[in-house]
Design a protein with these regions (language model features):
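Short coil/turn segments at secondary-structure boundaries
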Residues: 176-180
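Short arginine-rich
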Residues: 156, 173-175
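Beta/alpha (TIM)-barrel catalytic core signal, keyed to glycine-rich beta->alpha loops juxtaposed to Asp/Glu
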Residues: 1-167
Length: 182
């Protein structure tokens, strides 16, 4: 199987088209890997529509918003977390702002209402998105892996999916940035 990672929509289309140009000679693209979560929905702009059109599956990386969607950062940065690491803190920090906290609160509320965990709600949401084949989880121990795998039994009600869609709706500017600030 062949796949690509972090390609924008036009790059994905170009690679997939090139692969298809010689049937039987080149391997068809099976997947693309991009960051995708309730905190990062940018792939919905171009990458996901291209992947769906091309029959290429999406492997979302950081489906838990770099760990933030688990709720562990709601009251501070745990000492044993990636956010406390000097090396990884810059990776986590962009998702510790006010808009992200509103999304994390919505995930926690949904989890409480479903008697499950925020991790499971966030992972189920991304798992059920169109074009997603399998979220990539970064479990650091057996307990985290077990919890992530148990999401297979969770089905989110439509009302919760819609509420999470609404609170995390991306702002798409023409075409990809706010030109009024230039």
């Amino acid at each position: 199987y062949a796949g690509v990672s972090n390609f924008c929509g036009w790059q994905l289309a170009k690679a997939a088209t090139w692969q298809l140009a010689s049937p039987g000679v080149r391997t068809r693209l099976a997947s693309t890997q991009m960051e995708y979560s309730l905190l990062q929905r940018g792939v919905e702009r171009e990458v996901l529509p291209a992947a769906l059109d091309l029959g290429v599956g999406l492997l979302p990386s950081s489906p838990l918003g770099r760990g933030v969607l688990t709720g562990k950062y709601r009251t501070g940065t745990p000492a044993d977390s990636r956010g406390a690491s000097e090396l990884l803190a810059p990776f986590v920090e962009p998702y510790l702002d006010d808009p992200a906290s509103r999304i994390v609160d919505a995930v926690a509320t949904a989890a409480d209402g479903l008697a499950t965990t925020a991790l499971q709600v966030a992972l189920a949401w991304v798992r059920d998105r169109p074009g997603v084949v399998a979220p990539i989880v970064g479990a650091r121990n057996a307990q985290q892996l077990t919890e992530a795998l148990s999401v297979e039994a969770l089905s989110l009600p439509d009302e919760i999916c819609q509420a999470l869609d609404d609170v995390s709706a991306p702002v798409h500017r023409y075409p990809d940035q706010d030109w009024s600030t230039l």
